[in-house]
Amino acid sequence: MLEGAKSIGAGAATIASAGAAIGIGNVFSSLIHSVARNPSLAKQSFGYAILGFALTEAIALFAPMMAFLILFVF
């Protein structure tokens, strides 16, 4: 019974990877739109996009960590 609950919890924790993928797509979609509207701010926009990518990717890295914690620690 407990092993099944652990597997369900680990699976639910990895759903965050899909959300992170959507978030990264939104970050770079916004970058393309902003550069198309104002090309003179391309370098500044790219810096902000990389920051947004890094923060979004951090969530994607926390998801498998939580899944492994659920499976092997608790």
Curated annotation (Swiss-Prot):
InterPro entries hit by this protein: ATP_synth_F0_csu, ATP_synth_F0_csu_DDCD_BS, ATP_synth_F0_csu_sf, ATPase_proteolipid_c-like_dom, F/V-ATP_Csub_sf
GO BP terms: proton motive force-driven ATP synthesis
Keyword set, alphabetical order: ATP-binding, CF(0), Hydrogen ion transport, Ion transport, Lipid-binding, Membrane, Mitochondrion, Nucleotide-binding, Transmembrane, Transmembrane helix, Transport
Main location: mitochondrion
Transmembrane segment boundaries: 8-28, 50-70
Domain of life the protein comes from: Eukaryota
One of the record's GO cellular component terms: proton-transporting two-sector ATPase complex, proton-transporting domain
Feature type site, description Reversibly protonated during proton transport: E57
GO MF annotation list: ATP binding; lipid binding; proton transmembrane transporter activity
Topology class, membrane: Multi-pass membrane protein
Keyword Membrane recorded: yes
Entry keyword annotation includes Repeat: no
Alphabetical list of Pfam families matching this protein: ATP-synt_C
Compartment(s) where it occurs, according to its Swiss-Prot or TrEMBL record: Mitochondrion membrane
Biological function: This protein is one of the chains of the nonenzymatic membrane component (F0) of mitochondrial ATPase.
Subunit structure comment from the entry: F-type ATPases have 2 components, CF(1) - the catalytic core - and CF(0) - the membrane proton channel. CF(1) has five subunits: alpha(3), beta(3), gamma(1), delta(1), epsilon(1). CF(0) has three main subunits: a, b and c.
The family this protein is said to belong to: Belongs to the ATPase C chain family.
Official protein name in the record: ATP synthase subunit 9, mitochondrial
Species per Swiss-Prot/TrEMBL record: Brassica napus
Organism ancestry: Eukaryota, Viridiplantae, Streptophyta, Embryophyta, Tracheophyta
